Amino acid sequence: FKWIGRLNQAILGWKIRKAIGELNYEKPIIWTFLHQTAKVIDAINHSASIYHCVDDWPELLPMAKMGNPEQIKHDEWALIIRVGTIFTVSDKLLSHYQLPVGKVHFIPNGVDTTLFNPDDLPGTVLTEMSNLPRPIIGFSGSLGRWIDIDLIIQTARSFPAASVVIIGLNEKNPETQKLAGEKNIHFLGMKSRSEVPNYIREFDVCLMPFARTSVGQGLLPLKLFEYLSMGKPIIATNSGSLEIFRDVLYLADDSSMFIQQVKLAISEVDASLVRKRREKAHEYSWPARIQAYDSAISQSIDSKKIN
């Protein structure tokens, strides 16, 4: 359905041009998170153009039956060669392309360290969790196909006296049906963003059990920085993207090691590790991210003026 994509881009370009006229903007900065917007870039007179890549679309969208991987790559490459600047939230994203030198900036996700601040949270009693046995092994986020459901189940079975609590969206992953058979797994569903810190506060340790797929291996998710900002011990399946955070994570190379790392994290007593994680999160606060974006965009605009 290539014509649908072209039609969508034409409509989007027209709407943006209309808004630019109504707002009396001249040569705005075009900042897109959508891989299928090359024609939109062509249609708008701009001072700078940015593609902000937050996911491996050629792998992720076909999982949800939302496109052909080759067509997605074609559309994404058409965008890549048009924009002046590319931001990626993981150094593994876009690795299947031969990217233009100097155009790509690896800038991980930012975190709201004010919202995810355990010192400033209200004393809200979460009735869903108040009577659950401790320790609480928590997961916050989408249960997509990039999550290793079997590893969550293995964790629950390895710690039968603990409670495994999951908050977030079920991304129609058929594997999640297996969770219902585990007595100590509690799926609490979606929570508003303002509520999430209260739930993470109740977690004794936090999980990032990514599947051994190209999507899972390329993830550097927002939940990492939210967990860090709350100072929580984090157990994660190892990937190249997470190596730079090894000093603040319990990384595991396989399922057996993952369970051992959960055990170590649960028994953690060193308060300095909490401080270390929170300090790391502040390196990725939104003010720090905005400074990085601003620097890269300014370089792009200056380069365009010179050329």
Model-derived features: where do they sit?
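Conserved acidic donor-binding segment of nucleotide-sugar-dependent glycosyltransferases
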Residues: V248-M257, K263-D270
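Nucleotide-sugar-dependent
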Residues: S194-Y199, C206-L228, I235-D247
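A charged, aromatic-enriched C-terminal amphipathic alpha-helix characteristic of glycosyltransferases
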Residues: D270-S300
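Nucleotide-activated donor-binding/catalytic signature segment of Leloir-type glycosyltransferases, i.e.
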Residues: G168, P174-I200
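Membrane-proximal helix-turn-helix segments that form the acceptor-binding/catalytic region
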Residues: W14-G21, G67-I86
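Conserved donor-binding/catalytic core segment of Leloir-type glycosyltransferases
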Residues: M129-I147, I152-A156, I167
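Acidic anion/phosphate-binding donor-loop and adjacent secondary structure
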Residues: P62-K65, V111-E128, Q177
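Carbohydrate-associated surface elements
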Residues: V89-K92, I107-G110, D119, F203
